[in-house]
Amino acid sequence: MKKFVKGVRFAPKNYSDEVEAKIQHYKREGYKLPSRHLLRTEEQLAGIRESARINTALLDYISENIREGMSTAEIDHMVYCFTTDHDAIPAPFLYEGFPKSVCVSINDVVCHGIPSTKEFLRSGDIVNVDVSTIYKGYFSDASRMYMIGEVSPEMQRL
């Protein structure tokens, strides 16, 4: 029987065996899998940490500046400027043709909303801002939800 605590299942003692079995299964099925030893040095780990630090600072900056009435294109501009001012690159920009530096999803847009000069934040909106940063070749990715003005209890639960 699986153990649950507040909806979280404990990993079994043989968790690594289960993961290894799944990896071997996918290899047999012909899937290409990345090396499990992608990180080799402290320098590489430091690069990822610095990318993540910039990415998190960017989300904090957005927290301080996001407001009712601004367009999603203004959020994109903030992301581009902040990221490049920190000698980094916004990863989504021009990736596979994506035209912007950030994904901004309002209310019922599930993910990867494209910023626009015609879409404005209104009181009651919940907004997901998804940022990805490349710093010296190291990637980081995170998103954060923001509530604009007075948000209904139903929307807050999302």
What residue ranges belong to the model's regions?
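Active-site neighborhoods and metal-handling regions in enzymes and metal-associated proteins
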Residues: M1-L158
